[in-house]
Regions:
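Sec/Tat signal peptide C-region and signal peptidase I cleavage site
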Residues: 21-25
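Exported/periplasmic ABC-transporter solute-binding proteins
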Residues: 26-59, 63-73, 80-83, 87-96, ...
Length: 266
Protein backbone atom coordinates (compact mmCIF):
# COMPACT_ATOMS: atom_id res chain seq x y z
CA UNK A 1 0.00 0.00 0.00
CA UNK A 2 2.98 2.32 0.56
CA UNK A 3 3.71 2.21 -3.19
CA UNK A 4 0.10 3.08 -3.94
CA UNK A 5 0.12 5.97 -1.46
CA UNK A 6 3.42 7.35 -2.76
CA UNK A 7 2.43 7.17 -6.44
CA UNK A 8 -0.95 8.77 -5.91
CA UNK A 9 0.40 11.43 -3.54
CA UNK A 10 2.91 12.45 -6.21
CA UNK A 11 0.12 12.61 -8.77
CA UNK A 12 -2.04 14.82 -6.55
CA UNK A 13 0.87 17.19 -5.91
CA UNK A 14 1.54 17.37 -9.64
CA UNK A 15 -2.11 18.04 -10.42
CA UNK A 16 -2.21 20.94 -7.95
CA UNK A 17 0.64 22.76 -9.68
CA UNK A 18 -0.09 24.92 -12.71
CA UNK A 19 3.00 24.90 -14.90
CA UNK A 20 3.75 28.52 -15.78
CA UNK A 21 7.33 28.44 -16.99
CA UNK A 22 8.17 29.15 -20.61
CA UNK A 23 8.23 26.01 -22.72
CA UNK A 24 11.62 24.83 -23.83
CA UNK A 25 12.41 24.15 -27.46
CA UNK A 26 10.18 21.40 -28.86
CA UNK A 27 8.40 21.00 -25.53
CA UNK A 28 4.62 20.74 -25.84
CA UNK A 29 2.64 22.11 -22.91
CA UNK A 30 -0.29 19.84 -22.11
CA UNK A 31 -3.14 20.29 -19.65
CA UNK A 32 -4.47 16.78 -19.03
CA UNK A 33 -7.28 15.28 -17.01
CA UNK A 34 -5.96 13.38 -13.98
CA UNK A 35 -7.38 10.06 -15.21
CA UNK A 36 -4.75 10.12 -17.98
CA UNK A 37 -1.74 10.19 -15.66
CA UNK A 38 -0.33 6.70 -16.21
CA UNK A 39 -1.53 6.28 -19.79
CA UNK A 40 -0.15 9.66 -20.87
CA UNK A 41 3.17 9.10 -19.12
CA UNK A 42 3.62 5.95 -21.22
CA UNK A 43 2.27 7.56 -24.37
CA UNK A 44 4.49 10.60 -23.92
CA UNK A 45 7.60 8.45 -23.59
CA UNK A 46 6.83 6.67 -26.85
CA UNK A 47 5.96 9.95 -28.56
CA UNK A 48 9.31 11.45 -27.55
CA UNK A 49 11.16 8.33 -28.68
CA UNK A 50 9.54 8.49 -32.11
CA UNK A 51 9.54 12.25 -32.70
CA UNK A 52 12.21 13.73 -30.45
CA UNK A 53 9.61 16.09 -29.00
CA UNK A 54 8.92 16.27 -25.27
CA UNK A 55 5.63 16.95 -23.56
CA UNK A 56 5.34 18.94 -20.35
CA UNK A 57 2.15 17.76 -18.65
CA UNK A 58 0.10 19.29 -15.85
CA UNK A 59 -2.58 16.97 -14.44
CA UNK A 60 -5.79 18.14 -12.81
CA UNK A 61 -9.56 18.37 -13.17
CA UNK A 62 -10.95 19.22 -16.59
CA UNK A 63 -13.23 21.93 -15.21
CA UNK A 64 -10.38 23.70 -13.45
CA UNK A 65 -8.24 23.63 -16.59
CA UNK A 66 -11.18 25.03 -18.56
CA UNK A 67 -11.35 28.00 -16.18
CA UNK A 68 -7.57 28.48 -16.22
CA UNK A 69 -7.42 28.49 -20.03
CA UNK A 70 -10.22 31.07 -20.12
CA UNK A 71 -8.01 33.20 -17.89
CA UNK A 72 -4.98 32.88 -20.14
CA UNK A 73 -3.12 29.82 -18.84
CA UNK A 74 -0.31 29.04 -21.32
CA UNK A 75 -0.97 25.56 -22.71
CA UNK A 76 -0.63 24.12 -26.20
CA UNK A 77 -3.07 21.22 -25.85
CA UNK A 78 -6.02 20.36 -23.61
CA UNK A 79 -6.78 16.69 -23.01
CA UNK A 80 -10.10 16.84 -21.20
CA UNK A 81 -12.13 14.09 -19.54
CA UNK A 82 -15.26 15.87 -20.82
CA UNK A 83 -15.40 16.78 -24.50
CA UNK A 84 -17.75 19.68 -23.71
CA UNK A 85 -14.91 21.76 -22.23
CA UNK A 86 -12.76 21.83 -25.40
CA UNK A 87 -15.93 22.27 -27.45
CA UNK A 88 -16.77 25.41 -25.45
CA UNK A 89 -13.21 26.70 -25.88
CA UNK A 90 -13.54 26.28 -29.65
CA UNK A 91 -16.83 28.21 -29.67
CA UNK A 92 -15.23 30.96 -27.56
CA UNK A 93 -12.38 31.33 -30.04
CA UNK A 94 -9.77 30.07 -27.56
CA UNK A 95 -8.91 26.92 -29.54
CA UNK A 96 -7.81 26.16 -33.08
CA UNK A 97 -10.88 25.44 -35.26
CA UNK A 98 -11.15 21.90 -36.58
CA UNK A 99 -8.73 20.35 -34.08
CA UNK A 100 -11.31 18.98 -31.62
CA UNK A 101 -11.02 15.20 -31.36
CA UNK A 102 -12.82 12.61 -29.22
CA UNK A 103 -9.90 10.42 -28.23
CA UNK A 104 -11.50 8.01 -25.75
CA UNK A 105 -14.46 7.08 -23.59
CA UNK A 106 -13.74 6.54 -19.89
CA UNK A 107 -15.16 3.96 -17.49
CA UNK A 108 -15.69 4.02 -13.72
CA UNK A 109 -15.23 1.29 -11.13
CA UNK A 110 -15.85 0.66 -7.46
CA UNK A 111 -12.35 0.17 -6.05
CA UNK A 112 -11.20 -1.13 -2.67
CA UNK A 113 -7.74 -2.04 -1.36
CA UNK A 114 -6.58 -5.63 -1.73
CA UNK A 115 -6.94 -6.21 2.03
CA UNK A 116 -10.55 -4.95 2.19
CA UNK A 117 -13.06 -7.39 3.67
CA UNK A 118 -15.66 -6.66 1.01
CA UNK A 119 -15.08 -7.57 -2.62
CA UNK A 120 -16.93 -5.34 -5.10
CA UNK A 121 -16.33 -7.89 -7.87
CA UNK A 122 -18.66 -10.24 -5.96
CA UNK A 123 -20.98 -7.74 -4.29
CA UNK A 124 -21.32 -4.97 -6.86
CA UNK A 125 -23.11 -1.95 -5.38
CA UNK A 126 -23.69 -3.80 -2.12
CA UNK A 127 -19.97 -3.46 -1.38
CA UNK A 128 -20.58 0.23 -0.62
CA UNK A 129 -23.21 -0.69 1.97
CA UNK A 130 -21.02 -3.13 3.89
CA UNK A 131 -20.24 -2.46 7.58
CA UNK A 132 -16.94 -0.63 7.90
CA UNK A 133 -17.34 1.40 4.71
CA UNK A 134 -17.59 4.77 6.41
CA UNK A 135 -16.28 6.97 3.60
CA UNK A 136 -16.57 6.64 -0.17
CA UNK A 137 -14.27 8.79 -2.29
CA UNK A 138 -15.32 10.34 -5.58
CA UNK A 139 -14.06 13.27 -7.64
CA UNK A 140 -15.78 16.60 -7.06
CA UNK A 141 -18.81 16.52 -9.40
CA UNK A 142 -18.81 20.32 -9.72
CA UNK A 143 -15.79 20.29 -12.03
CA UNK A 144 -14.71 16.66 -12.53
CA UNK A 145 -16.49 14.52 -15.15
CA UNK A 146 -15.72 11.31 -13.25
CA UNK A 147 -17.40 12.77 -10.18
CA UNK A 148 -20.53 13.56 -12.16
CA UNK A 149 -20.56 10.03 -13.56
CA UNK A 150 -20.19 8.59 -10.04
CA UNK A 151 -23.16 10.57 -8.72
CA UNK A 152 -25.31 9.62 -11.72
CA UNK A 153 -24.46 5.93 -11.29
CA UNK A 154 -25.24 6.02 -7.56
CA UNK A 155 -28.60 7.62 -8.30
CA UNK A 156 -29.42 5.07 -10.99
CA UNK A 157 -28.42 2.26 -8.63
CA UNK A 158 -30.91 3.64 -6.11
CA UNK A 159 -28.40 4.03 -3.29
CA UNK A 160 -27.36 7.68 -3.53
CA UNK A 161 -29.46 8.78 -0.54
CA UNK A 162 -28.06 5.89 1.51
CA UNK A 163 -24.44 6.83 0.90
CA UNK A 164 -24.41 10.58 0.18
CA UNK A 165 -23.41 11.56 3.74
CA UNK A 166 -20.42 9.23 3.46
CA UNK A 167 -19.13 10.70 0.22
CA UNK A 168 -15.80 12.52 0.36
CA UNK A 169 -14.71 14.62 -2.60
CA UNK A 170 -11.30 14.77 -4.20
CA UNK A 171 -10.31 17.86 -6.16
CA UNK A 172 -9.89 15.48 -9.10
CA UNK A 173 -10.10 11.74 -9.70
CA UNK A 174 -6.46 11.21 -8.69
CA UNK A 175 -7.02 12.76 -5.28
CA UNK A 176 -10.12 10.61 -4.82
CA UNK A 177 -7.94 7.58 -5.54
CA UNK A 178 -5.38 8.76 -2.99
CA UNK A 179 -8.10 9.00 -0.34
CA UNK A 180 -8.82 5.28 -0.74
CA UNK A 181 -5.19 4.23 -1.04
CA UNK A 182 -4.24 6.13 2.13
CA UNK A 183 -7.12 4.69 4.16
CA UNK A 184 -8.93 8.02 4.48
CA UNK A 185 -11.80 6.33 2.64
CA UNK A 186 -12.63 2.64 2.55
CA UNK A 187 -13.94 2.63 -1.03
CA UNK A 188 -13.95 4.84 -4.08
CA UNK A 189 -15.69 5.25 -7.40
CA UNK A 190 -12.65 5.81 -9.58
CA UNK A 191 -11.51 5.90 -13.18
CA UNK A 192 -10.78 2.46 -14.62
CA UNK A 193 -7.60 3.99 -16.08
CA UNK A 194 -6.25 4.61 -12.56
CA UNK A 195 -7.50 1.27 -11.25
CA UNK A 196 -5.59 -0.38 -14.14
CA UNK A 197 -2.32 1.39 -13.29
CA UNK A 198 0.60 -0.46 -11.66
CA UNK A 199 0.08 1.05 -8.17
CA UNK A 200 -3.61 0.09 -8.04
CA UNK A 201 -4.15 -2.95 -10.24
CA UNK A 202 -3.87 -5.38 -7.31
CA UNK A 203 -6.88 -3.82 -5.58
CA UNK A 204 -10.41 -5.19 -5.67
CA UNK A 205 -12.69 -3.63 -8.25
CA UNK A 206 -15.98 -3.89 -10.06
CA UNK A 207 -16.63 -2.15 -13.36
CA UNK A 208 -19.82 -0.13 -13.15
CA UNK A 209 -22.08 -0.81 -16.15
CA UNK A 210 -21.66 1.92 -18.75
CA UNK A 211 -25.42 2.38 -19.07
CA UNK A 212 -25.66 3.68 -15.50
CA UNK A 213 -24.26 7.11 -16.39
CA UNK A 214 -23.78 9.36 -19.39
CA UNK A 215 -20.77 8.38 -21.52
CA UNK A 216 -17.52 9.92 -20.31
CA UNK A 217 -16.49 11.24 -23.72
CA UNK A 218 -12.98 12.65 -23.57
CA UNK A 219 -11.79 15.33 -25.96
CA UNK A 220 -8.51 16.84 -27.13
CA UNK A 221 -7.98 20.21 -28.77
CA UNK A 222 -5.14 22.52 -29.77
CA UNK A 223 -5.36 25.91 -28.07
CA UNK A 224 -4.95 29.35 -29.60
CA UNK A 225 -2.24 30.02 -27.00
CA UNK A 226 -0.11 27.18 -28.42
CA UNK A 227 3.45 28.26 -29.12
CA UNK A 228 4.31 24.96 -30.82
CA UNK A 229 1.31 24.24 -33.02
CA UNK A 230 3.31 21.84 -35.18
CA UNK A 231 4.26 19.84 -32.10
CA UNK A 232 0.69 19.95 -30.83
CA UNK A 233 -0.57 18.53 -34.13
CA UNK A 234 2.06 15.81 -33.98
CA UNK A 235 0.94 14.86 -30.47
CA UNK A 236 -2.72 14.61 -31.49
CA UNK A 237 -1.73 12.56 -34.53
CA UNK A 238 0.12 10.14 -32.26
CA UNK A 239 -2.85 10.03 -29.89
CA UNK A 240 -5.04 9.00 -32.87
CA UNK A 241 -2.56 6.43 -34.13
CA UNK A 242 -2.76 2.68 -33.58
CA UNK A 243 0.17 2.90 -31.14
CA UNK A 244 -1.50 5.64 -29.11
CA UNK A 245 -4.84 3.88 -29.15
CA UNK A 246 -3.30 0.65 -27.89
CA UNK A 247 -1.84 2.42 -24.87
CA UNK A 248 -5.21 3.97 -24.04
CA UNK A 249 -6.92 0.59 -24.36
CA UNK A 250 -4.35 -0.98 -22.04
CA UNK A 251 -5.51 1.45 -19.34
CA UNK A 252 -9.18 0.65 -19.77
CA UNK A 253 -10.25 3.38 -22.15
CA UNK A 254 -12.68 2.59 -24.95
CA UNK A 255 -11.66 4.04 -28.29
CA UNK A 256 -14.30 5.94 -30.27
CA UNK A 257 -15.46 4.60 -33.61
CA UNK A 258 -12.91 5.46 -36.33
CA UNK A 259 -10.09 5.80 -33.76
CA UNK A 260 -6.66 4.76 -34.94
CA UNK A 261 -4.44 5.96 -37.74
CA UNK A 262 -7.30 7.01 -39.95
CA UNK A 263 -9.28 8.88 -37.30
CA UNK A 264 -10.70 12.30 -38.02
CA UNK A 265 -11.69 15.20 -35.82
CA UNK A 266 -15.12 15.01 -34.25
Amino acid sequence: MNLVKCSLRCLVLTSCLLVLRTAEAQEIRVAAAADLKFALDELGAQFEKQTGRRINVSYGSSGNFFAQIQNGAPFDVLLSADIEYPRKLEVAGLAEPGTLYKYAVGRIVIWMPADARADPAKLGWKALLEPGVERIAIANPEHAPYGRAAVAALRNAGIYEQVRRRLVYGENIAQAAQFVASGSAQAGILALSLASSPPMRDGKRWEIPANMHAPIEQGAIILKSAKDKEGARALLAFLKSDAGGKILENYGFTLPVSAGAGATSQ
